[in-house]
Amino acid sequence: MAGHKVAHATLKGPSVVKELFIGLALGLAAGGLWKMHHWNEQRKTRTFYDLLERGEISVVAAEE
């Protein structure tokens, strides 16, 4: 029994380069999603003010 060896997985420390690339990829993905959301909100706001300026909509409640 003393001669038997069990294969164990060797644990390595964290790979700094790999973690940097993963962090960079996640950061760019999150930043891209945030910019797309921001552009969508800008488009909605711009459309609202364009319609308001042309008189197609009003922010004053219509009196009956």
UniProtKB/Swiss-Prot annotation:
Single GO cellular component term: mitochondrion
Transmembrane segments: 15-34
Keywords: Membrane, Mitochondrion, Mitochondrion inner membrane, Transmembrane, Transmembrane helix
UniProt-annotated location(s): Mitochondrion inner membrane
Protein origin, superkingdom: Eukaryota
InterPro entries: COX5C (IPR008432)
Similarity-based family: Belongs to the cytochrome c oxidase subunit 5C family.
Function per UniProt: This protein is one of the nuclear-coded polypeptide chains of cytochrome c oxidase, the terminal oxidase in mitochondrial electron transport.
Protein name: Probable cytochrome c oxidase subunit 5C-1
Organism this protein belongs to: Arabidopsis thaliana
